[in-house]
Amino acid sequence: MKLTKLLTYLMAEPVQNDFHDPDITSIEMDSREVRKGSLFVCIKGYTVDGHDFAQKAAENGAAAIVAEKELDVDVPVIIVRRSQRALSVLSDAFYGQPTKQLQLIGITGTNGKTSTTHMVDEIFKKAGRQTGLIGTMYIKIGDETFPVKNTTPESVTLQKTFKKMNDEHVDTAIMEVSSHALSLGRVHGCDYDIAVFTNLTQDHLDYHKTMEDYRQAKSLLFSQLGGSFNHEKPKRAVLNADDKASAYFEKVTAAHILTYGIENDADVMAKQIEISAQGTSFELVTPKGTKQITVSLVGRFNVYNVLAAAATGIAAGLPFDTITSALEELQGVRGRFELVNHNQPFPVVVDYAHTPDSLENVLNTCKDMTEGKLFVVVGCGGDRDKTKRPKMAEIAVRIADEPIFTSDNPRSEDPLAILRDMERGVEGTYYHSIANREQAIFFAIANAKKGDVVLIAGKGHETYQQIGNETFDFDDAEVAGRAIVELNKK
């Protein structure tokens, strides 16, 4: 694509250095990836400023550079107010606005995004759709998966992925949309058809600072649905009637709204809920029909995820029988209330719960399954919201019988300092502190007996532990498996 054509989407022109309207061969935000013909966009990140690498990009063959200020380089420079937003617009244009050829479903919220995204994917596949998925665990196009760095990729990677979905004849894309991606503008240019809200509880306050700012960031997904009423590509918002943030989201969108819930009156509801260690049964009540269903997932929090997925299917006009059939065939998502079974006499659960609300939910579910003692291994991430550390500890001590505090990606922080932050919330109470996560897991499993339950919280599907500047292989389920094998030898 010619540079002048690409710049029409920005309504911008080069203001520094002459140019001869080169062909743009790629869009890059990493100077190391720049080749002859690349358009380099300078992004100011948390620790690195792309403007500092503009000269390197020029030396590597950049045809032009997008920046927020003038630069000392010999290639054309396009100055914009916000280069992150410009990157989104340019990426969308460069790859041919690929989301216009998809039914695009965005799912946002503090907890439940990953589980709900996978449930929606299963429902749409059951309906005969060719699906793509973008989320915390991976990117999936058809049956092929690719690794990810962020819950929501950078905009150039995102649009490139959507273009690949177009090429692979995908018709429906389901994606997790993080608050970071929304506030940074990574998803500008994405033509969402259905926006889904799970819940809003404390998380990411290291970035958003206040819950109001956090809510505002989440609301951008719903305002991004636009104000038009296109019957060929209708817009829908799916909101949790039991979460007070939904009232705010309802105000910022012109899209048709479908609600779901358990407590408050909603379009899609679960009634007569019965939860056991084997699964959950309830009456699914919807505008399309009512049916008693049983899912293999455990916990009230999972009922909300199922309702959100069902409401999304209804919002898309899928047959009710297809939706319920897909839900009843659901398998668990890795790291989300994942049972680790090596013939030990007690359940061991691995779960991604890393916020106060999600930890309380999963602990209460485990408590209902516990005849003896409830063990929980839990930590708090380094370089993240410090205010939730004492809250997480208080919840663990209040609900569990054997709370064990440990490390969970301490990053640049001292693991012992993180533990001290947690302990400030539970002074004078009973708990264990074991900084080494592997030792903490082994301790819990070695001391559990028949009738007990062991919950390993915080990392879920993650297969690494970040300590300092290094990343080590670490998988809670694998470590738990080894601990159980050791226990079984005794």
Swiss-Prot record:
UDP-N-acetyl-alpha-D-muramoyl-L-alanyl-D-glutamate binds at residues 31, 150-152, 178, 186. One of its GO terms (molecular function) is UDP-N-acetylmuramoylalanyl-D-glutamate-2,6-diaminopimelate ligase activity. Its cofactor is Mg(2+). A motif (Meso-diaminopimelate recognition motif) lies at residues 408-411. Coiled coil: none annotated. ATP binds at residues 109-115. GO terms for cellular component: cytoplasm. It is found in: Cytoplasm. Signal peptide: none annotated. GO terms for biological process: cell division; cell wall organization; peptidoglycan biosynthetic process; regulation of cell shape. It is an enzyme of class 6 (ligase). NCBIfam families: murE (TIGR01085), PRK00139.1-2 (NF001124), PRK00139.1-4 (NF001126). Belongs to the MurCDEF family. MurE subfamily. This is UDP-N-acetylmuramoyl-L-alanyl-D-glutamate--2,6-diaminopimelate ligase.
